[in-house]
Amino acid sequence: MNEIIRKDILKVLSATIEAFKQQRFQDFSAISNQTIHNATIYQDEDSLAVAVLVYALGKVATRCMETGGKCPNLLPQLNALDGLLAQDRQEEYRAAMRKILDDIRAFDEKMHMYIEEVLQKARLKKGSKLHEHG
C-alpha cells in the first residue's frame, strides 16, 4: 500500500472512530464523501474498502437511530483496524477489514446496495472531474 494512501486511511479511521465514540453519526456522511473522493483519486482496493465501510456504518447507524433498534458495537473492530494499519501490518489489516464488512453484511442485508452506491458516487465524481478538466 502506498504510504500516502495508508496515512490518508489512518486519518479517515481516526475521524470515524471519534464520530462513533461520540455518537455523531451525522458526521459519517462527510467522512464518507471524503473517502469516496479518495477512492476516486487513488483507485485502489484499500481506499474503496474504507469508503464502503464508512458509508455502510453511516447507513446502519442512521437506521438504528430512526428505528430505535440495537446497533452492533463495531468500535473494537474499528480500533483494531486503526492499530493494524498504524503498525503497517497490511495483510492483517485487510483480513480485519473483510471481517468487519462481513459483520455489517450479516447485520444489514442491504450491504450489497451500499457497495453499489459507493461505486456509483465514485464514478460520478470521476466523470465530473474529467468533464471539469476537459
Roles of regions detected by a PLM:
Residues K7-L10, L75, K121-K125:
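Amphipathic alpha-helical repeat elements characteristic of tetratricopeptide repeat
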Residues G83-R105:
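Short, charge-rich, low-complexity alpha-helical interaction segments
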Residues D103-G134:
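Conserved binding-pocket/active-site segment within a compact domain
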Residues S14-I17, D82, S128:
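Amphipathic alpha-helical repeat scaffolds
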